[in-house]
Amino acid sequence: MLINNKKLLHHILPILVLALLGMRTAQAVAPGIVIPPKALFTQQGGAYGRCPNGTRALTVAELRGNAELQTYLRQITPGWSIYGLYDGTYLGQAYGGIIKDAPPGAGFIYRETFCITTIYKTGQPAADHYYSKVTATRLLASTNSRLCAVFVRDGQSVIGACASPYEGRYRDMYDALRRLLYMIYMSGLAVRVHVSKEEQYYDYEDATFQTYALTGISLCNPAASIC
């Protein structure tokens, strides 16, 4: 029996090693989420996940990825307080600042919800940045009237872009950009998308891509090698 066990281990150990290496490789290449800066945090959400216009509920992953915000929350949350997150809860100062997972919306039963504003002034100058041969997915009409889309290439998210009718220097272009977004989203056409990085948006929860102000969309010529 001992000999058989040794033979079994001899065959299994290489497989286990390869499996562990595969797990580490998968973890290494998995894209991390974009963490909102602490400056976007606001505690002004009410019960049932009611975040003010222009804000949304903070997610568990975003909070876990922001050590500065965790330190700040441990300082400002009084006593045995509990707060709602988009997909969890935060147990305040007396609990030790514990972050707990829950299904989306389950934490909205508490009196206050942690919210973040969804627009960030990056300080970058106005400049044209473009991404070629991308298609629009995940169309989102946000609570603050922005229309956003995620642009992908070969199945990978490349960039997010939003158009707004009310804010930013490109608001006068909203109607034209909105029509173009709907058209390319429905048709699946490959395009070149143009963005400005003066403003960064956080409308998508746990995004693995940056999202900026949409400034233009150019259709690709299928007969041309350059888009």
Curated annotation (Swiss-Prot):
> Where found in the cell?
Secreted; Host cell membrane
What's one Pfam family here? APT
Major localization listed first in the record, in broad terms: secreted
**Signal sequence residues:** 1-28
Instruction: Give any GO molecular function from the UniProt entry.
Output: toxin activity
UniProt keywords, alphabetically: Disulfide bond, Host cell membrane, Host membrane, Membrane, Secreted, Signal, Toxin, Virulence, Whooping cough
| Cited Gene3D superfamilies | 2.40.50.110, Aerolysin/Pertussis toxin (APT), N-terminal domain
Highest taxon of the lineage: Bacteria
Q: Where is it found, in Gene Ontology cellular component terms?
A: extracellular region; host cell plasma membrane; membrane
Q: Which pairs of positions does the record mark as disulfide bonds?
A: 51-115, 148-162, 220-227
Instruction: Name the job this protein performs.
Output: PTX oligomer B binds to receptors on the eukaryotic cell surface and facilitates the translocation of the toxic subunit across the cell membrane.
- Provide the assembly information: Pertussis toxin contains five different chains, S1-S5. They are organized into 2 functional subunits: A, composed of S1 (which is toxic) and B, containing S2, S3, S5, and two copies of S4 (B binds to the membrane receptors). Dimers of S2-S4 and S3-S4 are held together by S5.
User: Family per UniProt?
Assistant: Belongs to the pertussis toxin S2/S3 subunits family.
Name of the protein: Pertussis toxin subunit 3
User: What is the protein's species of origin?
Assistant: Bordetella pertussis (strain Tohama I / ATCC BAA-589 / NCTC 13251)
Name the lineage. Answer: Bacteria, Pseudomonadati, Pseudomonadota, Betaproteobacteria, Burkholderiales
What is the gene name?
ptxC
